């Protein structure tokens, strides 16, 4: 297995981990915890009783960015799988990288918005759902770099293939 294929495989694995962490973060209700209970993007639980959170603009932006980040991340991973499996395919790694970087940017926007909204509250602590979102960010960015580097290797190989010199 060459360097290009190793980078592509690594990018797929990293994007899979990022997507699992993003889905876990988005779906669970442990973004913050208080003395009385915990809350997430969808529900707030106090003393064991959970209810829907009333619509707030900042929270709506966070939810939208998280859902879009998951969707864009899954599309990027599927594109990466197609590149890895279809050797003759002319799909470029730059597009896959762009999708993975966009997913990371949307994730970063969601997490910063949620942090700004809740950082100044007393007796509110961020919990594991929130931190799994932050943990997904470097995986998404690293996956994008893997596909970008693999594409650069492919471009350089194509560029020097016409030269009679054996490197």
Curated annotation (Swiss-Prot):
One of its GO terms (cellular component) is plasma membrane. It holds the Pfam family PMP22_Claudin. It comes from the Eukaryota. It is a multi-pass membrane protein. InterPro entries: PMP-22/EMP/MP20-like (IPR050579), PMP22/EMP/MP20/Claudin (IPR004031), PMP22_EMP_MP20 (IPR004032). The chain crosses the membrane at residues 7-27, 59-79, 96-116, 134-154. The keyword Membrane applies. It is found in: Membrane. Keywords: Membrane, Transmembrane, Transmembrane helix. The keyword Transmembrane helix applies. PANTHER family: CLAUDIN DOMAIN-CONTAINING PROTEIN 2 (PTHR10671:SF30), EPITHELIAL MEMBRANE PROTEIN-RELATED (PTHR10671). Belongs to the PMP-22/EMP/MP20 family. This is Claudin domain-containing protein 2. It comes from Homo sapiens (Human).
């Amino acid at each position: 297995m060459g360097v290009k294929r190793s980078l592509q495989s690594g990018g797929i694995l990293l994007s899979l981990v990022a997507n699992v962490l993003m889905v876990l973060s988005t779906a669970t209700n442990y973004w913050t915890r208080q003395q009385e209970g915990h809350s997430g993007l969808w529900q707030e639980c106090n003393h064991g009783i959970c209810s829907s959170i009333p619509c707030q603009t900042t929270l709506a932006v966070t939810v939208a960015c998280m859902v879009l980040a998951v969707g864009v991340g899954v599309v990027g991973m599927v594109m990466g799988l197609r590149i890895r499996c279809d050797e003759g395919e002319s799909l470029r790694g730059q597009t896959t990288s762009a999708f993975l970087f966009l997913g990371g940017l949307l994730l970063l926007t969601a997490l910063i918005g949620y942090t700004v909204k809740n950082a100044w509250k007393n007796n509110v602590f961020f919990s594991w759902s929130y931190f799994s979102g932050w943990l997904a960010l470097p995986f998404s960015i690293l996956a994008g770099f893997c596909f970008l580097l693999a594409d650069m290797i492919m471009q350089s190989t194509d560029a020097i293939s016409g030269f009679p010199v054996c490197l």
